[in-house]
């Protein structure tokens, strides 16, 4: 679970906005 497991991976804007997920 977390942004790095999301469809866009850690480079996506969503992930950067939720950096604690990484």
Curated annotation (Swiss-Prot):
The modification Cysteine amide is found at residue 22. The keyword Nuclease does not apply. It is found in: Secreted. InterPro entries: Conotoxin_mu-typ (IPR008036). Disulfide bonds join 3-15, 4-21, 10-22. PROSITE patterns: MU_CONOTOXIN. Is commercialized under the name XEP-018 by Activen in the cosmetic area. When applied as a cream, it is claimed to reduce fine-line wrinkles. One of its GO terms (cellular component) is host cell postsynaptic membrane. Expressed by the venom duct. The keyword Disulfide bond applies. The modification Pyrrolidone carboxylic acid is found at residue 1. Keywords: Acetylcholine receptor inhibiting toxin, Amidation, Disulfide bond, Ion channel impairing toxin, Neurotoxin, Postsynaptic neurotoxin, Pyrrolidone carboxylic acid, Secreted, Toxin, Voltage-gated sodium channel impairing toxin. One of its GO terms (molecular function) is acetylcholine receptor inhibitor activity. Mu-conotoxins block voltage-gated sodium channels (Nav). This synthetic toxin blocks both voltage-gated sodium channels and nicotinic acetylcholine receptor (nAChR). Inhibits the skeletal muscle rNav1.4/SCN4A (IC(50)=1.3 nM) and the brain rNav1.2/SCN2A in a long-lasting manner. A low inhibition is also observed on neuronal mNav1.6/SCN8A and mNav1.7/SCN9A. Modestly blocks nAChR alpha-3/beta-2 subtype (IC(50)=450 nM) (partially reversible) and, to a lesser extent, alpha-7 and alpha-4/beta-2 subtypes (reversible). Belongs to the conotoxin M superfamily. Negative results: 1 uM does not block cardiac mNav1.5/SCN5A and DRG-specific rNav1.8/SCN10A channels. 5 uM does not block voltage-gated potassium channels rKv1.1/KCNA1, rKv1.2/KCNA2, hKv1.3/KCNA3, rKv1.4/KCNA4, rKv1.5/KCNA5, rKv1.6/KCNA6, Shaker, hERG1/KCNH2. The cysteine framework is III (CC-C-C-CC). This is Mu-conotoxin CnIIIC. The lineage of its organism: Eukaryota, Metazoa, Spiralia, Lophotrochozoa, Mollusca.
């Amino acid at each position: 679970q977390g942004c790095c497991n999301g469809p866009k991976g850690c480079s996506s804007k969503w992930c950067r906005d939720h950096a604690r997920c990484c």
